[in-house]
Amino acid sequence: MNSLAKTTLLAATTALLAGPALGPSYAQGTDFQSCLQTIKADATRQGVPAAIADRAFQGLTPDQKVVDLDSRQPEFSLTYSKYVGGAVTPDRVTKGQQRMAQHRALLDALQAEYGVPPQYIMAFWGVETNYGTFMGDFQVVRSVATLACMTKRRDFFSNETVQALRILAMNHMTREQMRGSWAGAMGNMQFMPSTFMKWGVDRTGDGRIDLWTSLPDAFASAANFLRGIGWKPPLPASEEVFLPQGFPLDQADTTVEKPVRAWAQMGVKKAGSAALPSSDEPSSIILPAGHRGPAFILYPNFKAVMNWNRSTLYAMSVAILAQQIAGGAPVMQGPPADDEPLSRDAVIDMQNRLARLTLYTDEVDGLLGPKTRSAVRLYQKQIGLPADGHPTPEFVRRLQQAR
């Protein structure tokens, strides 16, 4: 069977199961079994046989471990050095190169069809499941049903539960076989059920989409998903760059976009001093560890990687790992020695202090997000520090001394 005949959006086999979007969210405190019946009703409206839903929900109880994991708040904010350093290791690079060589024919065929370079499929595989060595052992139907009925994200996970039932209805696997992370991500590439349904590919043509044991299906699904969420050749996702002396640090932000050639005209070069591509594609410069750490240019494909996972540090990890799997050099500029995570309480204190200075007006949540970094940048400008939006120990000390 040629690739065009193989299912990508499950078009041929899902016509029976197509249906309307999920209805309104469930009221706080709804009984678990009652909640399951509401989800079943939504699923049957989308074509799932009632017997399939009944079998999937038979004896199902909420998973308290999933509830606990969902409610757990991180004690410390993530930093570039800790996150990327843990995701991009020499061992992971070497294994990625070995697996890319092992599956080269398949990966080259997928690149020709979908436009996604092999090293990116390998990088996602490496970051998501360490090349398939740990795909999670939670029962997916139980996990997503628990999250739908016992947490605040009812709409999202109710839909994921319906999509999991649709997967069962199409005989891709049994409830017991459908295992993944506590949040419902499945298989080598950790697809949510809705992602499986929309972007899954039966590359082998056996009538089933198997993201667990069929690497052709898993890799093709990843390539199809990436193309669907915006990947376009030929530029990579990102590259390390060197900034010229006097570069305006307030321009190093994802909200600032310029054509690649405009950054080149400002004196930005690739790390190692090679010229940037001659391109009019929109791009941004970021400093994930502040002005003393590495700088990167983000090309449009970085947004595609972010559409897979909304974490900038996750996307940086995938981009850096892909570059090194393809034989590129490690990042040349290391992070500063004091690139240490801030505790949640420390971020809350910082947000409160910035709010008293009328620089921060958003929710005090203990998260070092874009709005908090913007407020940090404003105060850095006021006190004469480099305005890179990163709260260094000196910044924190100066802020605590402010009256």
Model-derived features with residue positions:
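Short acidic, glycine/serine/threonine-rich helix-capping segments at coil-helix boundaries
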Residues: 342-347, 355-399
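Catalytic glycan-binding domains that act on GlcNAc-containing polysaccharides
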Residues: 48-277, 293-296, 305-344, 366, ...
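Intrinsically disordered, low-complexity polar regions and short flexible loop motifs
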Residues: 43
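Bacterial N-terminal signal peptides that target proteins for export
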Residues: 1-11
